[in-house]
Swiss-Prot record:
This is Beta-glucosidase 8. Disulfide bonds: none annotated. Residues 1-22 form the signal peptide. Belongs to the glycosyl hydrolase 1 family. Its EC number is 3.2.1.21. It holds the Pfam family Glyco_hydro_1. InterPro entries: Glyco_hydro_1, Glyco_hydro_1_N_CS, Glycoside_hydrolase_SF. One of its GO terms (biological process) is carbohydrate metabolic process. Glycans are attached at residues 65, 202, 354, 452, 474, 490. Keywords: Glycoprotein, Glycosidase, Hydrolase, Signal. A beta-D-glucoside binds at residues 42, 139, 184-185, 319, 387, 430, 446. PROSITE patterns: GLYCOSYL_HYDROL_F1_2. The active site is at 185 (proton donor), 387 (nucleophile).
Length: 497
């Protein structure tokens, strides 16, 4: 018989109900940013146009599950239409990434003028509508040429090439970009794409027991190198901020046993501390060093000093919360994910409810717990919630009520965390529109706008969530008093596929 952690049950009840308290956009700090996001490969399309060369994501998606981002949402050609949707919504910031292989097709050296022009035009269009660009430099899409040449992130050479790429971006776009994320969810990228069963960029197997941690180490060094370059060369004039983002599940013990409590602390060390402890204190968590031994790379004294303090903010990617136990449990992540990483972690993950590839349970207290943990453990750094959203099957109705309920609950959690002292400065819904998704292709989607992927024109249609977010941002929706039935009725009369 399962014995639930009583404290966790109480927290679920108390914290979940607390989010129904009335709040509006005006309850957040004036400089808090509400936005939405996409990434280059998932949004742009135009994979073979205007000088772009293949990235490892092209290679992986073409050989993995048959669907790909060759056209995706065709954002490359439809960016003005999408910016207009953002402006109509009242979006304050738009998070997007720059395709390395579109801007610098060979990975280093020559800049592609058409790629450069596209991003300059996109940023100009955003600025002309009063929308703050938040630019991610790396969202999984390493130029395939660098993977073929030296193995990408498992080779120390990546640090120099990534820094040179970042230098081009800072120089060309930095006057109009004040928020930079170097690497998207570095944790899950390292353990998910360097696993035993799926190999990133070349679809072959490798030494996954070592490469996960080598890749993570090189990401930290590359981030620090780019960050230090920015601060030395550009920050005094451009006055921007630069950070790194991590994948942060909410983590809570499955039972009230001491073993599950300890397993949860180990999981937090591996999933949060792997990146955050070096960024804040200059070294890896003791739990990782004890467990991994020589498999965990070591920072030199100089590297430690470079990494420490290299993030002006921490980006958080959060979708749901899981239980953690010390006892063997069914594996809930996709079969392609690196199971050996979780074996190293010495903790088993259990879903809190009905979460799947097509739906996430809304567990807003889990996000609040993540923010409170980072506040207490890592000196309360500035935080941006860079991805938070709920997937649904792509052919679902436009009335995506579960997504609306999910988003408003998590926004309430962020507000609670801010009131408790968390220095959280922004919240970005994932995603603005339906995208190509890395694990499931076009089977499920996160978008607030529906995209008809069967239509060559990739027609966009607003979902209920777009209507709700618009109302929240322009101040016409009070979360506690909002009549969901009336919102659905108004919406159903104005939108169709």
């Amino acid at each position: 018989m399962k014995h639930f952690n009583l404290l966790s049950i109480i927290l679920v009840i108390v914290l979940a109900t607390s989010y129904i308290d009335a709040f509006t956009r005006n309850d957040f700090p004036e400089d808090f940013l509400f936005g939405a996001g996409t990434s280059a490969y998932q949004w742009e399309g135009a994979a073979n146009e205007d000088g772009r060369t293949p990235s490892v994501w092209d290679t992986t998606s073409h050989c993995y599950n048959g669907s790909n981002g060759d056209i995706a949402c065709d954002g490359y050609h439809k960016y003005k239409e999408d910016v207009k949707l953002m402006a109509e919504m009242g979006l304050e910031s738009f998070r997007f990434s720059i395709s390395w292989s579109r801007l610098i097709p060979n990975g280093r050296g020559r800049i592609n003028p058409k790629g450069l022009l596209f991003y300059k035009n996109l940023i100009k269009e955003l600025r002309s509508h009063g929308i703050e660009p938040h630019v991610t430099l790396y969202h999984y899409d390493l130029p395939q040429s660098l993977e073929d040449e030296y193995g990408g992130w498992i080779n120390h050479k990546i640090i120099e090439d990534f820094t040179a790429f970042a230098d081009v971006c800072f120089r060309e776009f930095g006057e109009d970009v004040k928020l930079w994320t170097t690497i998207n969810e570095a944790t899950i990228f390292a353990f998910a794409f360097y696993g035993k069963d799926v190999r990133y960029g070349n679809c072959t197997t490798g030494n996954y027991c070592m490469e996960t941690y080598i890749a993570g180490h090189n990401m930290l060094l590359a981030h620090a190198s780019a960050s230090n370059l920015y601060k030395l060369k550009y920050k005094s004039k451009q006055r921007g901020s630069i950070g790194l983002s991590i994948f942060a599940l909410g983590l809570t013990p499955y039972t009230n046993s001491k073993d599950d409590e300890i397993a949860t602390q180990r999981a937090k060390a591996f999933l949060y501390g792997w990146m955050l402890k070096p960024l804040v204190f200059g070294d890896y968590p003791d739990e990782m060093k004890r467990t991994l031994g020589s498999r965990l790379p070591v920072f030199s004294e100089e590297e430690s000093e470079q990494v420490k303090g290299s993030s002006d903010f921490v980006g958080i990617i959060h979708y749901t919360t899981v239980y953690v136990t010390n006892q063997p449990a069914p594996y809930i992540f996709p079969s392609s994910t690196n199971k050996d990483f979780f074996t190293d972690m010495g903790a088993y993950i259990i879903s809190t409810g009905n979460s799947s590839s097509f739906v996430f349970d809304a567990v807003p207290w889990g996000l609040e717990g993540v923010l409170q943990h980072i506040k207490h453990r890592y000196n309360n750094p500035p935080i941006y919630i860079l991805e938070n959203g709920s997937p649904m099957k792509h052919d679902s109705m436009l009335q995506d009520t579960p997504r609306v309920e999910y988003i408003q609950a998590y926004i309430g959690a962020v507000l609670n965390a801010i009131k408790s002292g968390s220095d959280t400065r922004g919240y970005f819904v994932w995603s603005l529109i339906d995208l190509f998704e890395v694990q499931v292709g076009y089977k499920s989607s996160f978008g607030m706008y529906y995209v008809n992927f069967s239509d060559p024109g990739r027609k966009r249609s607003p979902k209920l969530s777009a209507s709700w977010y618009t109302g929240f941002l322009n101040g016409t929706i009070d979360v506690a008093s909002q009549d969901m039935t009336q919102l659905q009725r108004n919406f159903s009369g104005s939108s169709s596929l």
